[in-house]
Regions:
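Active-site environment of divalent metal-dependent phosphoester hydrolases
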Residues: 10-15, 39-41, 65-68, 107, ...
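Anionic-ligand binding region
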Residues: 134-174, 180-184
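Metal-dependent catalytic neighborhoods of phosphoester/phosphodiester hydrolases
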Residues: 37-54, 68-76, 126, 160-165
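Acidic, His/Gly-rich catalytic cores of divalent-metal-dependent hydrolytic chemistry
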Residues: 162-245
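Beta-strand-turn-beta hairpins that frame and shape the catalytic cleft
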Residues: 1-4, 107-114, 178-183
Length: 245
């Protein structure tokens, strides 16, 4: 089975549309979204509509949780709070109800894949996995994570290989899974990459070949940025799209 996995769209319709168009060449059998459909960008409803139509299952991200009243975001910085408040006012009843019902994780038993937005440890706290020491916390739940655990949240592409007693960070490039290891993979961001590559990030996992692939695609950043400004959101949310941070 060829699985398309993407995350952190952040209301960037132009990036999401480019990713879904690129996926058409990948012979994808099923799609999964790892959360944060909303937040930061100018097209929350349009992106929610597309994700609902495309993904078999979508995971709850922290911005999704904030917009839908499922977490306290009073500690977020002012511009981020403003965007979340604006999106809450913009979302249709259907899309708001959808966000309210999203799960924190999903285990795909048939392919031994765990899906979450952030770390699988303390799911409701949406913790990051940037480095091996953070991935090492997952060793305590070795029997509960998948052969591969796919996450978003950091907006970075990261790969960590785990044994029951050791964690190693691998290069963020295509790789084949080894049977005696487990993997935590951060799939990057569709709508707001933060690795100084402004192209939208998306991934493919071939569960038959046990092969994971990272993909990037260019999109109309100028239009996406213009929509941020027209929505009267923070100017930096538009500017950062051009530099990929």
């Amino acid at each position: 089975m060829r699985i398309g996995i993407f995350s952190d769209i952040h209301a960037n319709l132009e990036a999401l549309s480019a990713v879904l168009e690129a996926y058409k060449t990948e012979s994808i059998d099923v799609y999964y979204c790892l959360g944060d459909t909303v937040g930061y960008g100018g097209s929350p409803n349009e992106c929610a509509d597309l994700v609902r139509e495309t993904a078999k299952k979508t995971i709850l991200g922290n911005h999704d949780a904030a917009v839908s009243g499922r977490m306290d975001y009073s500690y977020y910085y002012e511009a981020a709070r403003h965007a979340l408040d604006a999106h809450a006012a913009m979302l249709s009843e259907t899309n708001m109800a959808w966000l309210k019902a999203l799960p924190y994780q999903e285990m795909l038993e048939e392919v031994n894949v765990l899906l979450c937005h952030g770390s699988p440890v303390r799911l409701e706290e949406f913790e990051y996995i940037f480095a091996p020491e953070q991935a090492r916390e997952c060793l305590s739940m070795w029997d509960k994570i998948g052969h591969i655990t796919l996450i978003g949240h950091s907006h970075l592409c990261k790969v960590f290989a785990l044994t029951p007693s050791h964690v190693e960070e691998l290069p963020s490039m295509d790789f084949d899974l080894e049977p005696d290891k487990k993997y935590i993979v951060s799939v990057g961001s569709v709508g707001q990459p933060r690795d100084f590559d402004n192209r939208a990030s998306y991934t493919v996992y071939d569960s038959d070949k046990k092969r994971f692939e990272f993909k990037r695609i260019e999109y109309d950043i100028e239009l996406a940025a213009d929509k941020v400004l027209r929505a009267r959101l923070e100017r930096n949310f538009a500017h950062r799209l051009f530099i990929g941070v």
